[in-house]
Amino acid sequence: MEMNLRIEDLNEETKTLISSLPSDKDFTGKTICKYQGCWYTHNVLQAVLNFQKSFKPQDTDIIVASFPKCGTTWLKALTFALLHRSKQPSHDDDHPLLSNNPHVLVPYFEIDLYLRSENPDLTKFSSSPRLFSTHVPSHTLQEGLKGSTCKIVYISRNVKDTLVSYWHFFTKKQTDEKIISSFEDTFEMFCRGVSIFGPFWDHVLSYWRGSLEDPNHVLFMKFEEMKAEPRDQIKKFAEFLGCPFTKEEEESGSVDEIIDLCSLRNLSSLEINKTGKLNSGRENKMFFRKGEVGDWKNYLTPEMENKIDMIIQEKLQNSGLKF
């Protein structure tokens, strides 16, 4: 997902900043540093700095935000399908989601666009609204948005399922198995808050508070609710985006068509997602695993469950947020 720049290939601003930041190793053995309360690899930190400095937001922009492995691919597909359904109905044989991975249609600021350039050419995003995505926490994102009133949709997920999916994804990503930590070691690091884009609880709370302070511009969604009540959740999402379903659309089955098109079952079965690759070389199939609620029960011991539950209870105390 990210280019592998050596430390000497980073610009001077980034190298100087890194030398002053707290650092640690993530569970793959990669050096990460803590900037504005969040852990980043050196490459991604440089991209975050580029984004904060150079991005020129438009008030019509839509940004999909998430902590890694919380349902980002699914939410990107839904966002694209909802916003483009008037010109590109979900039942069209040439719908872009049938031939493109959702991460191509909704690129990341810090992993795609600003990783490769300090000031990337965004003119190809000429249609309005422009669609972008990010894994950075809210306060870091807002610095790049410079007071814009664009809309942000955030997807959260139960911390235990997030951890399991996170470990599987980065284990598949890592080619040198000798430096992969065990699930138990990864669990301990995660509980300490040492994970790429972590700590998890700080990340989630940053967007939760944003949604309470400005519900017209920040929508906080939960993976579990989307799985349990897809029609209600997607209708609410469309309302937030400013493209609510008409009575005629609902009667014609448009909501269910979008649910089917964007389902993980359908997306993972597409040829582009079985054999295709992103520009980075990452295989599209890596973004699809189970997408289930409760898979953590196959991995966490009762002691692990109790420990992480106590941490989450403490970190989310008095916030009003529950999983």
Curated annotation (Swiss-Prot):
Q: Report the active site residues.
A: H135 (proton acceptor)
Q: Name one GO cellular component term.
A: cytoplasm
Q: Which residues bind 3'-phosphoadenylyl sulfate?
A: K69, C70, G71, T72, T73, W74, R157, S165, R289, K290, G291
Mention one GO biological process in which this protein takes part, according to its record: flavonoid metabolic process
* Induction (UniProt): Up-regulated by trans-zeatin, but not by cold, heat, hypoxia, salt stress, auxins, gibberellins, wounding, etiolation and salicylic acid or methyl jasmonate treatments.
The record, for SUPFAM superfamilies, names: P-loop containing nucleoside triphosphate hydrolases (SSF52540)
Instruction: Tell me a Gene Ontology molecular-function term this record carries.
Output: flavonoid sulfotransferase activity
Q: Which UniProt keywords apply?
A: Cytoplasm, Transferase
State the top-level EC class: transferase
Record-listed E.C. numbers: 2.8.2.-
Q: What pH-dependence text does the entry carry?
A: Optimum pH is 7.5.
Q: Where in the cell is it found?
A: Cytoplasm
Provide the tissue specificity: Expressed in inflorescence stems, roots and siliques.
**Entries under PANTHER family matching the protein:** SULFOTRANSFERASE SULT (PTHR11783)
Q: Which family does it belong to?
A: Belongs to the sulfotransferase 1 family.
Q: Which purpose does this protein serve, as stated in its record?
A: Sulfotransferase that utilizes 3'-phospho-5'-adenylyl sulfate (PAPS) as sulfonate donor to specifically catalyze the sulfate conjugation of flavones and flavonols. Strictly specific for the position 7. Substrate preference is kaempferol 3-sulfate > isorhamnetin > kaempferol.
Q: What is this protein called?
A: Cytosolic sulfotransferase 5
- What is the species listed in this Swiss-Prot or TrEMBL entry? Arabidopsis thaliana
